[in-house]
From Swiss-Prot:
Protein source organism: Callithrix jacchus (White-tufted-ear marmoset)
The keyword Nucleotide-binding is annotated on this UniProt entry: no
Taxonomic classification: Eukaryota, Metazoa, Chordata, Craniata, Vertebrata
Stated name of the protein: Myoglobin
Binding site for O2: H65
Modified positions (Phosphoserine) in chain numbering: S4
Localization, UniProt: Cytoplasm, Sarcoplasm
Gene name of the encoded protein: MB
Length: 154
């Protein structure tokens, strides 16, 4: 299930584009997630009241959380699958405190791919998309395994 060196390079190349503007990428990913899967909003007390896309775009809190999410994910992706230390606290908080189901991690993975396709069509062709999907699946599978260890059936 691991990625080849070439696949990791494709992932990290496009991730460099994300890091050049994390706030707008993070905001777009969360808006895409909430629009595509409104039920996910219920897990976010500070965003539940945001009903329209305009309200979401105007929310500094949402933008800030998008930065947090993509910064954490970037740290994990840069470990090229050797992300045990980074994953453990994330799985702990998402399983025990936030109670985020694995399905929602799938939804946000789809949102990330969607936003990258939209914002970077020239740098995110079929090979890069395949590599990113594989990297995000590896992340989700490892999160699910940690959830299981923690007794969370998310």
């Amino acid at each position: 299930m691991g990625l080849s060196d070439g696949e990791w390079q494709l992932v990290l190349n496009v991730w460099g584009k994300v890091e050049a503007d994390i706030p707008s990428h993070g905001q777009e990913v969360l808006i895409s997630l909430f629009k595509g899967h409104p039920e996910t909003l219920e897990k976010f007390d500070k965003f539940k009241h945001l009903k329209s896309e305009d309200e979401m775009k105007a929310s500094e809190e949402l933008k800030k959380h998008g930065v947090t999410v993509l910064t954490a994910l970037g740290g994990i992706l840069k470990k090229k699958g050797h992300h045990e230390a980074e994953l453990k606290p994330l799985a702990q908080s998402h399983a025990t405190k936030h109670k985020i189901p694995v399905k929602y991690l799938e939804f946000i993975s789809d949102a990330i791919v969607h936003v990258l396709q939209k914002k970077h069509p020239g740098d995110f062709g079929a090979d890069a998309q395949g590599a990113m999907k594989k990297a995000l699946e590896l992340f989700r599978n490892d999160m699910a395994a940690k959830y299981k260890e923690l007794g969370f059936q998310g």
